[in-house]
Amino acid sequence: MAPSWLFLLFIPGMVGSSRSCFPGCQCIVDNFGLFHSFSLTKVDCSGVGPHVVPVSIPLDTSYLDLSANGIKRINESVLSGPGYTTLINLNLSHNQIVRISFSTFSKLRYLESLDLSHNLLETLPDGSFLYSRLTELDLSSNKLLEVGIGAFTLKSQGRSMTINLGNNNIRSIHRGAERPVPNIHSLTLSGNDLLSVPDLHGIPLRHLDLDRNPLAKIEKESFLGLEGLTHLSLSDLPNLREVSPYSFKTLPSLLDLDLSSNPQLKSLSSDMFFGLDSLQELNLAYSGVAALPKDIMLNLPSMKSITWGENIRCSKTVKESPFHAQKGRVREEVLLCHDDYGAVPAQDVL
């Protein structure tokens, strides 16, 4: 039922009107249907103050904004009652929430998007969001030191999630065998304190962002069990000095690899790219790599473009030689490179 509401939110011709609301809040009603027979309400209570909770909301509320209110505690009793059972989107960002429990969001059975960014959360209990139907979860800019994968397990595992854990203080990500592996599609871990690539084995990730962590080395089996990964960002790692050979060999589906802005990374071996048969985009801009391996293309059969140096962009193209009486026309793959000033000979790059 909830997904059909989301679809209706974008139907052309819907009519919005205001209605009576909790003091300090604004309630906007969106009407749907030929005779406006169906409606959903968006409630904006941002910046009202900590006294706003618990807030009474209309029965047909789909969106509730409680951001920037200085809220310190949030629990099940605050997020229950008439109106809360239909919530699809809840914004609790820019508050002072220190903790949540496994029951805090247990009554929000149709919740799909939850923003808890810019709070003071230090821990996440296992099953924190178990009874929701989350597809988007923002936990960025909190005070998290370690995170258990079990926190993101949902009772209904059919829908994939996008999770943002960026800009915390995360040093480790641990997992237990007691819960099913969560269905996480995209995971952002940028701006944390990770010293090594966390064990994410078996999670059906397609996007992984590890930018701005103190990683010094990418080990050989760092990405084991992530065969479905298509986009990997390892940019702006100030301590990264080494990427081991065969580090990415377990990523046959990877399309995009970002290793830009890593000034301590001075060289790369061709074996580092072994197994990247699907890779199309490689970003090495503003890294410390002086030149690319001459046989780099042997391990990158699907490569379309490489960005390198201070803005050198190389694209792979097929060059056809003039017709030869015995050989006919010979076709070969070559790199064509250029920067902001014009063409750059490929031999200066390789």
UniProtKB/Swiss-Prot annotation:
It is found in: Secreted. GO terms for cellular component: extracellular space. Keywords: Developmental protein, Glycoprotein, Leucine-rich repeat, Neurogenesis, Repeat, Secreted, Signal. Its main location: secreted. LRR repeats lie at residues 60-81, 86-107, 110-131, 133-154, 159-180, 183-203, 204-225, 228-250, 253-275, 278-299. It comes from the Eukaryota. Residues 18-59 form the LRRNT domain. Transmembrane segments: none annotated. Residues 1-17 form the signal peptide. GO terms for biological process: bone growth; energy homeostasis; growth plate cartilage chondrocyte development; nervous system development. It holds the Pfam family LRR_8. Glycans are attached at N75, N91. Interacts with bmp4. Interacts with dll1 (via extracellular region). Interacts with fgf8; inhibits fgf8 signaling. Interacts with nodal2/Xnr2; enhances nodal2 activity. This factor is named 'Tsukushi' because its expression pattern in chick embryos is similar to the shape of the Japanese horsetail plant, tsukushi. Contributes to various developmental events through its interactions with multiple signaling pathways. Dorsalizing factor which functions as an inhibitor of bone morphogenetic proteins (BMP) during gastrulation. Promotes dll1-dependent activation of Notch signaling and is required for neural crest formation. Induces endoderm and dorsal mesoderm formation by enhancing nodal2/Xnr2 activity while inhibiting ventrolateral mesoderm formation through inhibition of fgf8. This is Tsukushi. It comes from Xenopus tropicalis (Western clawed frog). The gene is tsku.
